[in-house]
């Protein structure tokens, strides 16, 4: 997974706040949707451009609570999550695309 530009997008954060009541959940969901299905919080923070993984802890917990992620054991004491099948991942990508389209329109 490579670095994504929408992690710190004000439009993505605003739409995330509207949809989920939390400004990082949408970008997090999109990054997970684009992954191979196994993700690590530290790697996600780096990919999204966040300084620390602490901003992802509650959104990850909520995704586990919703049954969209399953926490799995990792190597060397690292935590990993497995993405579960759901249309929610495609929905997250659609929302990010909409937010970025509105961002592009606003800058033109």
Region spans (language model):
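Amphipathic alpha-helical dimerization/coiled-coil segments
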Residues: 4, 88-108
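Short amphipathic alpha-helical interaction segments
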Residues: 50-65
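A short, conserved structural fragment
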Residues: 64-74
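Short acidic, hydrophobic short linear motifs in intrinsically disordered regions
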Residues: 37-47
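Short amphipathic alpha-helical elements of helix-turn-helix/winged-helix folds
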Residues: 30-35
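Short alpha-helical segments that sit at the start of domains
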Residues: 2-28
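Short, cationic-aromatic polyanion-contact patches
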Residues: 18-24, 40, 74-97
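Exposed, interaction-prone assembly regions rather than primary DNA-binding/catalytic cores
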Residues: 4, 17, 46, 53, ...
């Amino acid at each position: 997974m490579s670095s994504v530009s929408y992690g710190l997008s004000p439009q993505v954060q605003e739409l995330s706040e509207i949809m989920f009541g939390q400004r990082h959940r949408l970008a997090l969901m999109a990054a997970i949707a684009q992954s191979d299905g196994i993700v690590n919080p530290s790697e996600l923070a780096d990919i999204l451009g966040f300084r620390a993984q602490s901003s992802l802890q509650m959104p990850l917990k909520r995704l586990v609570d919703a049954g969209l992620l399953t926490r799995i054991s990792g190597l060397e004491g690292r935590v990993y999550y497995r993405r579960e099948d759901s249309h929610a991942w495609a929905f997250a990508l659609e929302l990010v695309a909409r937010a970025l389209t509105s961002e592009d329109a606003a800058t033109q």
